[in-house]
Amino acid sequence: MPFAELLGIDVKNAARDEVRAQMAWSERLCTTAGVMHGGALMALADTAGAVCAVLNLPEGAATSTIESKTNFFRAVREGHVDAVAHPLHVGRTTIVVQTDLYDATGRRIAQVTQTQAVLSSGGSGGTAGGGRL
């Protein structure tokens, strides 16, 4: 996952029912005020959520994010961010994943809910490798 590598995202654990990933605070991922940029946080959540969706795909299927909603609760000014993704719905045409983001002290800083399309092997996905990570 080249974009995830660019951001320094490290997938710590990946299973069908839970994916855990982490991203370190870095000045290059911040706004001018030293706060981690919301787009970086959303990219962390999208990465963990997409991995969760891929692990729940039927054999030969691919996926692409078709909807994502983020609620931000706190700013991150240091440390790292942990992402914990769980599938809320695994269906024939969509997979819905909820990803909670936590700061280094364990406080929830954001919650992301995303919907992933389940694409047949003949479909065109937005994820590199035909929707498989």
Which residue ranges define each predicted feature?
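Non-catalytic linker/capping segments at the edges of enzyme domains
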Residues: 1-22, 127-133
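Short connector loops at helix/strand junctions that flank enzyme active sites
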Residues: 4-6, 16, 36, 48, ...
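Short, small-residue-rich loop/turn micro-motifs
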Residues: 23-27, 116
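A conserved, well-ordered hydrophobic junction motif at loop->secondary-structure transitions
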Residues: 26, 30-44
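Active-site helix/loop of acyl-thioester processing domains in fatty-acid/polyketide metabolism
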Residues: 39-62
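HotDog/MaoC-like acyl-thioester-processing domains
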Residues: 57-59, 76-78, 82-133
